[in-house]
Amino acid sequence: MNLRIGEGWDVHALVPGRRLVIGGVELEHPMGLGLLGHSDADVLLHAITDALLGAAALGDIGRHFPDTDAAFRAADSRLLLAEAARRVRAAGYEIGNIDSTVVAQAPRLAAHIPAMRLAIARALGVDQGQVNVKAKTAEGLGPVGQNLAIEARAVALICATPGAGAIGPAAQRVSSAWSGSGA
């Protein structure tokens, strides 16, 4: 069994005049703030996207969906996450599970976690039981604690699709070289 783990992290500044979307769910910030970014700035989905791409050794969100590309301006991060999942599957892996944490002083997120889990599971094409979202505050510390930013972290577990031999192109070359069959 070939298991791989990826880690993702993202942070976006809170500013007036922007929507606040976390985990594919639009929320209201008590101070009327939203997240600044090229896309919809969904900090949680960006962290999960990075974790998945990293687990499959496919780089990061900036490589696949650069903020210099107008095609991704105001993009729905659920679509970016779905495309990242498609690329992970194309590389020969299936998604095992996602564990994630959002760190925000406000708004309170606990009541929104079921909707976030559902939105993430739908974007990934997995069962909701494969997705976990936790919410924490920064206890008033740092930029997150001062309502200047929201941060998210994620871990993704992926496993090779049976029969796909998903060890990645570089590892396949090394394996071939070791077995004497050349690169």
Swiss-Prot record:
It comes from the Bacteria. Its cofactor is a divalent metal cation. The record marks 38, 137 as: Transition state stabilizer. Binds 1 divalent metal cation per subunit. It comes from Verminephrobacter eiseniae (strain EF01-2). CDD domains: MECDP_synthase. The gene is ispF. The keyword Lyase applies. Coiled coil: none annotated. 4-CDP-2-C-methyl-D-erythritol 2-phosphate binds at residues 10-12, 38-39, 60-62, 65-69. This is 2-C-methyl-D-erythritol 2,4-cyclodiphosphate synthase. GO terms for biological process: isopentenyl diphosphate biosynthetic process, methylerythritol 4-phosphate pathway; terpenoid biosynthetic process. Its EC number is 4.6.1.12. Involved in the biosynthesis of isopentenyl diphosphate (IPP) and dimethylallyl diphosphate (DMAPP), two major building blocks of isoprenoid compounds. Catalyzes the conversion of 4-diphosphocytidyl-2-C-methyl-D-erythritol 2-phosphate (CDP-ME2P) to 2-C-methyl-D-erythritol 2,4-cyclodiphosphate (ME-CPP) with a corresponding release of cytidine 5-monophosphate (CMP). Homotrimer. It catalyses: 4-CDP-2-C-methyl-D-erythritol 2-phosphate = 2-C-methyl-D-erythritol 2,4-cyclic diphosphate + CMP.
